[in-house]
Amino acid sequence: MSWSFLTRLLEEIHNHSTFVGKIWLTVLIVFRIVLTAVGGESIYYDEQSKFVCNTEQPGCENVCYDAFAPLSHVRFWVFQIILVATPSVMYLGYAIHKIAKMEHGEADKKAARSKPYAMRWKQHRALEETEEDHEEDPMMYPEMELESEKENKEQNQSKPKHDGRRRIREDGLMKIYVLQLLARTMFEVGFLIGQYFLYGFQVHPFYVCSRVPCPHKIDCFISRPTEKTIFLLIMYGVTGLCLLLNIWEMLHLGFGTIRDSLNSKRRELEDPGAYNYPFTWNTPSAPPGYNIAVKPDQIQYTELSNAKIAYKQNKANIAQEQQYGSHEETLPADLETLQREIRMAQERLDLAIQAYNHQNNPHGPREKKAKVGSKAGSNKSSASSKSGDGKTSVWI
């Protein structure tokens, strides 16, 4: 096993566990693995060679040692470390696999779709100054927002700090984490009970053996019983500490989940769903190609007002055609029909103007001149439209 693999393993455990789990990992590495590897081997290396019995009967000493220690202390603790750490290693492997799969899926989605520039529509006042109709027409134009600026804005936003529990829940690993925690606790309890029944709380200085092939009860003596007793009690304490950390972590997960649910409910009560959207005073923008019409002041509904509205609508249609389809190849096939409708609209407008002027000033000489001028203007406009070379130019 290389150091890089061990470093990667510890980093992943650090990222996918709570702060109580990190304490448990520290206790496992320092007080179990290191202590068993360094202290256990040096204390128990001569446990069988220094096990001496006061008999010369062949095989009696081996049988008595088997009765005294059915399983070596060091091997028992190594087996305990392996089984206790197995649920955590399995959880870690599952977490790495799931997160790598999620990242791979997100990378495929990003590669499938292109990265368009973020566009914002702003009002430009300089374009309005080139027109001569003295009307307020909102002009919109797109503004490109670079992707780097967008990423910088996202990075500048402060993220809430957490101890790992919320990250486990966001990654969908909470159930697996709780299962491995329960399995780890069960292993701790099982090994604690087994250690008590195998070794008790003390290593006695001598052991009385009466098993076959020993001819009678004999006394066997153990080397360094006090040192081994102290080390045995230390291992009891480490096992109890790990068990308490497991219980603490379960309480931490339970109370933390309850607290998060209560906080979410309180936020829902404080911030109703109907008012979750932010209020803004910005003027709503329109997509490209969308004409925003300003609502005019209401005037008295007469034939003249109706004719003016029709004239303005025709003028807006002509301006839109000149803006988006001024080329000859884009003109419709029924151009003559369009010209005929425009002439009819102009004639109706002239008649409405004459009727309106006649209604207001029935005996004024200026009215006659206006009528003659309007008729001459209408004749000129009709003549110009007939003599045109196929373009929709109108003289008024």
UniProtKB/Swiss-Prot annotation:
Transmembrane regions listed in the UniProt entry: 23-45, 76-95, 176-198, 229-248
InterPro entries for this protein: Connexin (IPR000500), Connexin45 (IPR002265), Connexin_CCC (IPR019570), Connexin_CS (IPR017990), Connexin_N (IPR013092), Connexin_N_sf (IPR038359)
Extracellular side: 46-75, 199-228
GO BP annotations, alphabetical order: cardiac muscle tissue development; cell development; cell-cell signaling; chemical synaptic transmission; gap junction assembly; vasculogenesis; visual perception
Topology in the lipid bilayer: Multi-pass membrane protein
GO cellular component, one term: nucleoplasm
Biased composition (Low complexity): 373-396
Subcellular location: Cell membrane; Cell junction, Gap junction
Cytoplasmic side: 1-22, 96-175, 249-396
Disordered: annotated segments: 145-165, 357-396
Main localization, broad class: membrane
Organism superkingdom: Eukaryota
Keyword terms: Cell junction, Cell membrane, Gap junction, Membrane, Transmembrane, Transmembrane helix
Disulfide bonds: none
Biased composition (Basic and acidic residues): 147-156
Any GO MF annotation of the entry: gap junction channel activity
Subunit structure: A connexon is composed of a hexamer of connexins. Interacts with CNST.
Entry's family note: Belongs to the connexin family. Gamma-type subfamily.
Function, as annotated: One gap junction consists of a cluster of closely packed pairs of transmembrane channels, the connexons, through which materials of low MW diffuse from one cell to a neighboring cell.
Name of the protein described by the UniProt record: Gap junction gamma-1 protein
Native source species: Sus scrofa (Pig)
Origin organism lineage: Eukaryota, Metazoa, Chordata, Craniata, Vertebrata
